[in-house]
Regions:
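Short, flexible coil/linker segments at or flanking structured domains
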Residues: 9, 54-56, 63, 90, ...
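Outer membrane beta-barrel
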Residues: 1-86, 94-99, 103-110, 114, ...
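A short, polar/proline- and glycine-enriched secondary-structure boundary/capping micro-motif
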Residues: 45-46, 89-90, 171-173
Length: 224
């Protein structure tokens, strides 16, 4: 899988967005291996809105990574490691960041739902935080994070929800909130209704989202 992205920001650049390979045969074994560059499975960002949820803004982490996964009967477990853009001050530039992801999805009486959770050893490697952390990419310490998300589809209605937070605070000199180290978090709730208007599928959706201690990341405190 290879995907390029075109950005018309005045420079009209084309850059590599994703490039990875998956090794496995789901018909014979539930285990698989994925290697390359992509957004690691930290967070559930499905949405019917035209803008990304704040959880994605906070935590989407695209890295060159190696992932080992297991998927069977609706259960998925994944673990991955990567060498992030940020490093502990004084440490060697090596593969020492990692993440875990687990999810379950099923269908009951025509209704489908999914739940998932994840852990990331260093949320500083998310695109938003890396671009805004003060003092470059050398950190006093890694800042782990966790998240939970879910969805429910029943008839024409679809519901999404997610929560993500740093487990610890950043050093105040790296990412601050009210003159102290920030511990950014975000959540989103969304409801969508799928129908037809003039024989065309149409989705009507509403959302409520919020962030905490994310002023330094230029994230809105609330979004509707």
């Amino acid at each position: 899988h290879i995907q390029f992205i075109y950005e018309d920001d005045g420079t009209e650049t084309i850059s590599l967005d994703e490039a990875y390979a998956i090794i496995g045969n789901s018909e014979k074994t539930p285990t698989y291996l994925q290697a390359g560059k992509w957004a690691v499975p930290f967070g559930g960002f499905d949405t019917a809105m035209s803008t990304d949820p704040l959880t994605k803004t906070l935590g989407e982490t695209a890295e060159a990574a190696l992932l080992v996964g297991y998927s069977k009967n609706g259960f998925t477990l994944e673990g991955y490691g990567y060498n992030g853009d940020t490093q502990k001050s004084g440490d060697d530039d090596e593969i020492d960041q990692f993440g875990l992801h687990g999810s379950f999805e099923t269908e009951v009486s025509g209704n489908s739902f999914s739940i998932g959770a994840g852990y990331l050893s260093n949320i500083s490697d998310s695109g938003t935080i890396t671009d805004n952390v003060t003092g470059g990419t050398a950190l006093a310490d890694y800042v782990p994070a966790w998240e939970a998300h879910g969805s429910l589809t029943t008839g024409p209605f679809v519901f999404y929800g997610g929560y993500m937070t740093a487990k610890d605070s950043f050093a105040s000199g790296e990412l601050a909130f009210n003159s102290q180290g920030a511990q950014p978090a975000a959540w989103n709730l969304e409801a969508a209704y799928v129908t037809e208007i003039k024989n065309k599928e149409t989705t009507l959706a509403v959302t409520m989202q919020a962030s905490e201690e994310a002023l330094a990341l230029s994230m809105p405190e609330t979004r509707y």
